[in-house]
Amino acid sequence: MKKILVAVVVALFSINAMAQHEIGAIVGGMNGASYKYWFNDALALQADLAVGLTEAAGKTSVSQYDFTLNPNVEYHWALPVENLKIFAGGGLNFGLCNNLKYGNSNTVAGKFGINAITGLQYDLASVPLALAFDFRPGYGMSFDKNSNTSHFFDWKIAFAVRYKL
């Protein structure tokens, strides 16, 4: 039993030794805070808490802006350029949005959706910074207190700067 306990403790410490945290800011279609947790060299969880314009805003009567939590799971592949990776994955987005109704009435609505994510990340060699550029197409729905539901396709382009902890 002691051997199993020692093996589990060693495994937990080795997981933390591989883990890398990044924290910073994201700007573009979303503006806010960005956090990335690396499970290993290729698999990461990225979570962004941001305010932004919904890209469908000028084309539909769905939403003008949103406040979103957007967690994504990403898989990274190394490219021939040193410290440059391409990534792809998917995630959820949920939060609040300013729901524009027919006429001129404005209501705050809940929002939920799914999205894909793809982009490039460059890790600076001389300082512990990561620069990332990503594209996020997605599908979502907003719902207000009167059970009115709106469906929309949305996309965001964003640039992130994160400090490696």
Show where each model-derived region lies:
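Flexible, surface-exposed loop regions and adjacent strand-edge segments
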Residues: N104-T107, N148-D154
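Outer-membrane beta-barrel "beta-signal"
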Residues: F153-L165
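Sec-dependent N-terminal signal peptides
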Residues: I4-F13
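Short helix/strand-capping connector loops at secondary-structure junctions
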Residues: R136-D144
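C-terminal binding/interaction regions
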Residues: D134-R136, A160
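Solvent-exposed loop/turn segments connecting transmembrane beta-strands
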Residues: H21-S34, V51-Y65, V81, F143-F152
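Gram-negative (and chloroplast) outer-membrane scaffold detector with strong preference
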Residues: Y37-F133
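Sec/Tat signal peptide C-region and signal peptidase I cleavage site
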Residues: F13-A19
